[in-house]
C-alpha cells in the first residue's frame, strides 16, 4: 500500500492519483450533477497531507476489516451463532461477487459501502450508545451517492425505534447533502428553463437496457443476482467466475433460505429488504422492467442513480449474514433431526459454517489473483508538464479530445486522468459508450465537440482556454481532421507535446458567462460543509463514548486488598 507520486489507481471508473487536484469536477462545482462527490472532494482536500492512493487503500482495507468484524458481531449477538459461523460470515463480507466486480469496475467506494453494511446494521441496532461510530460509517458509505442510499436503507431497517430511525436517516441526509442539494438546485433552476436545459436533469432512457442486470452462465439473471453478481459490464466479471462459480452462488443462496422463516420472525424488515434486493433487479432486467425503467429515467429527475440495478444486491449482504448465522445455529440445536444420528450439534454447525465459507470462496475461486488489475500503474511524465502549463492560467475550461470521459491506453480502459489531475475546469462531457451506444451527456458540451470535429471554431466563445488531445486514444485519426484545422488556426498554439499528449492554448477565451457563480457553487459547497459537520460530530461522539468506556473499565477493576 506504499504510495508513490508517479503512480495511481487507474481502472475503468477509478482514477485515484497521489494528489487529487481541487478543480471544478472534484469539488462538484460544475453545472452538471457531480458524479463522485464527496468522494473526490475528500481526496482533493486530504491528499496534500495524505496521498490519495494511500487514503483509498486505507479506506478499502478498513471497510473490509470493519465489515467482517461487525458481521461476526451480528452472527454472535443477533443470531446467537458460535465461532465457526462468525468466521464464515467474516469471510463472506469481503469475498463475494458484488464486492469483487465493483472493485474491478473501479467503483471502489461502492464496494467499500457494501462491505460496511453489516457494521452499519449492527451499530444501528445497538442504539444511541453506538451513534458516534455509526455516523462516521454513514459518512464513509456516503462518499458515493449509491453508498448513501445503502446506508439509509440499512439504518431504516435495523434502527430499534422510530426516534432512532429518524435521527439516523437525518444523518444520512446530511451526509448525502453534497449531491442532494445540487440535485434540488438543478431541478429548481431547470423548472423555469427551456426544454434543452430541462433535459439535462434527466437521464437518457436508452441507458436502461445497457445498465440492466446481466445474465450469467448456466444460472440466468436471477441466479446471478442470487449469488450477488450480475454486473452490467461483462468485462468487470472475474475470469474465474464460470459455471462452477455461478452455480455455487445459487446453492449458497438456497441454503441460506433454510433460515428465512426464522429471519422473518425476528427481523421481518431485514427479510423483506433481502428478498427485494434480489427480486427487483431481476424484474428490471425483463422487457417490461426495462420499459418501466426507461419511463422513469425520462420522467423522474435524477433517477439515473437507480438504473444500475444490480448494485442494489449489496442491500442483501446484512440479511445474508443473519441467514448464514441462523442456518448454522439451527444445526447446533439439541433437537436436531434423527437422521443425523449421533453427530453432535457442535460438529454439525461447524460443518455447515465450513460449507458456507467454501461456497463463498467458490463464487470467485481466484479472488486474490483477480485483483491484479487494481495494482497502481505508472502515469506518463507528460502529466507534470500539462499540469504546470494549465496551472499558469487555470481560468477557463479544458476540453478533452477525443470526445468522451474514458480513455484506453495499453489495453486498460479508464476514466481520463485529466478530470482529476488538472486545475481549473476540465470538461466532463458526461456521456458513456455502452455496447456501442452513446448514452447521457451534457448537451452544451456535446454541441461544442460536434462543432470542433466539424471544423467550426467555437472554443473562444465557449470559454475554453485549453484543448488536450490524447492521440493514443484516437481510434481513427481521420475523425480528428476537422478539429486539427481549428487547433492549427490563428489564435491557438501548441503548448505541450509529449508521450502521445498534445496541449493547445486558446488565446483570449470569453470567460465572463462561462465561470460558475458563487450562487451556482453554493449548494455543493454547503453540502460539503454539512458532510464534514456530520463526520466531525460522529468522530467527537465516538471519542467521547470510547473515553467513557475506558474510564468505566478502569474504575470497575478490583483494587488490591491492603495487607493488614
Show the residue positions of the predicted features.
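Hydrophobic, aromatic-rich transmembrane alpha-helices
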Residues: 226-233, 243-278, 534-549
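Membrane-interface helix-loop junctions at the exits of transmembrane helices
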Residues: 2-7, 84-106, 177-191, 214-231, ...
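Membrane-embedded helix bundles of polyisoprenyl
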Residues: 64-78, 84-160, 165-180, 355-363, ...
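Extracytoplasmic
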Residues: 192-199, 359-564
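Signature aromatic-anchored transmembrane alpha helix within multi-pass, membrane-resident enzymes
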Residues: 83, 173, 328-364, 527-535, ...
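Membrane-helix boundary/interfacial segments in multi-pass membrane proteins
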Residues: 25-26, 98-111, 239-243, 271-323, ...
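Membrane-interface coil-to-helix junctions
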Residues: 1-67, 91, 95-103, 108-112
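Periplasmic/ER-lumenal interhelical loops and adjacent helix-loop junctions
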Residues: 19, 23-25, 42, 177-258, ...
Amino acid at each position: 500500500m506504499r504510495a508513490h507520486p508517479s503512480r495511481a489507481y487507474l481502472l475503468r471508473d477509478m482514477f485515484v492519483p497521489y494528489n487529487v487536484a481541487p478543480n471544478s469536477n472534484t469539488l462538484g462545482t460544475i453545472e452538471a450533477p457531480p458524479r463522485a462527490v464527496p468522494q473526490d472532494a475528500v481526496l482533493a482536500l486530504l491528499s496534500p497531507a495524505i496521498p490519495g492512493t494511500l487514503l483509498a487503500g486505507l479506506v478499502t482495507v478498513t471497510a473490509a476489516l470493519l465489515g467482517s468484524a461487525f458481521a461476526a458481531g451480528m452472527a454472535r449477538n443477533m443470531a446467537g451463532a458460535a465461532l465457526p459461523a462468525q468466521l464464515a460470515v467474516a469471510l463472506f463480507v469481503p469475498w463475494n461477487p458484488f464486492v469483487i466486480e465493483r472493485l474491478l469496475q473501479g467503483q471502489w467506494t461502492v464496494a467499500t459501502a457494501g462491505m460496511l453494511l453489516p457494521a452499519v446494521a449492527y451499530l444501528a441496532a445497538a442504539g444511541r450508545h453506538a451513534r458516534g461510530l455509526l455516523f462516521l460509517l454513514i459518512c464513509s458509505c456516503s462518499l458515493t451517492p449509491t453508498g448513501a442510499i445503502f446506508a439509509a436503507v440499512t439504518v431504516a431497517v435495523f434502527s430499534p425505534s422510530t426516534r432512532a430511525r429518524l435521527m439516523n436517516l437525518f444523518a444520512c441526509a446530511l451526509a448525502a447533502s453534497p449531491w442532494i442539494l445540487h440535485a434540488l438546485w438543478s431541478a429548481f433552476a431547470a423548472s423555469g428553463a427551456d426544454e434543452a436545459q430541462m433535459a439535462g436533469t434527466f437521464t437518457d432512457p436508452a441507458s436502461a437496457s445497457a445498465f440492466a442486470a446481466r445474465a450469467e452462465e448456466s444460472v440466468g439473471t436471477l441466479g446471478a443476482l442470487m449469488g450477488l453478481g450480475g454486473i452490467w459490464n461483462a468485462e468487470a466479471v472475474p475470469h474465474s467466475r464460470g459455471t462452477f462459480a455461478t452455480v455455487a452462488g445459487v446453492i449458497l443462496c438456497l441454503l441460506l433460505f433454510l433460515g428465512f422463516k426464522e429471519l422473518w420472525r425476528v427481523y421481518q424488515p431485514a427479510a423483506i429488504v433481502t428478498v427485494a434486493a434480489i427480486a427487483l433487479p431481476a424484474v428490471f432486467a425483463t422487457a417490461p422492467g426495462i420499459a418501466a425503467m426507461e419511463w422513469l429515467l425520462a420522467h423522474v429527475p435524477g433517477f439515473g442513480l437507480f438504473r444500475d440495478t444490480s448494485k442494489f444486491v449489496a442491500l442483501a449482504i446484512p440479511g445474508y449474514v443473519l441467514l448464514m448465522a441462523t442456518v448454522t445455529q439451527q444445526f447446533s440445536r439439541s433437537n436436531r433431526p434423527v437422521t443425523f444420528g449421533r453427530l453432535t450439534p457442535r460438529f454439525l454447525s461447524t460443518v455447515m459454517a465450513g460449507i458456507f465459507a467454501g461456497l463463498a470462496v467458490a463464487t470467485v475461486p481466484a479472488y486474490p489473483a483477480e485483483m491484479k488489475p487494481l495494482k497502481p500503474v505508472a502515469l506518463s511524465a507528460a502529466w507534470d508538464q500539462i499540469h504546470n502549463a494549465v496551472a499558469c492560467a487555470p481560468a477557463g475550461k479544458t476540453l478533452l479530445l477525443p470526445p468522451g470521459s474514458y480513455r484506453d491506453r495499453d489495453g486498460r480502459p479508464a476514466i481520463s486522468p485529466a478530470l482529476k489531475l488538472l486545475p481549473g475546469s476540465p470538461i466532463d462531457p458526461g456521456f458513456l459508450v455502452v455496447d456501442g451506444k452513446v448514452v447521457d451527456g451534457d448537451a452544451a458540451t456535446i454541441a461544442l465537440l460536434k462543432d470542433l470535429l466539424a471544423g467550426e471554431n467555437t472554443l473562444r466563445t465557449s470559454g475554453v482556454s485549453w484543448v488536450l488531445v490524447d492521440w493514443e486514444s484516437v481510434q481513427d485519426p481521420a475523425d480528428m481532421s476537422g478539429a486539427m484545422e481549428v487547433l492549427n488556426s490563428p489564435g491557438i498554439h501548441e503548448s505541450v507535446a509529449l508521450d502521445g499528449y498534445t496541449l493547445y492554448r486558446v488565446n483570449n477565451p470569453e470567460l465572463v458567462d462561462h465561470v460558475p457563480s458563487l450562487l451556482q457553487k453554493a449548494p455543493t459547497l454547503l453540502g460539503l460543509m454539512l458532510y464534514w459537520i456530520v463526520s466531525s460530530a460522529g468522530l467527537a461522539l465516538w471519542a467521547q463514548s470510547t473515553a467513557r468506556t475506558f474510564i468505566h473499565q478502569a474504575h470497575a477493576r478490583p483494587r488490591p486488598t491492603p495487607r493488614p
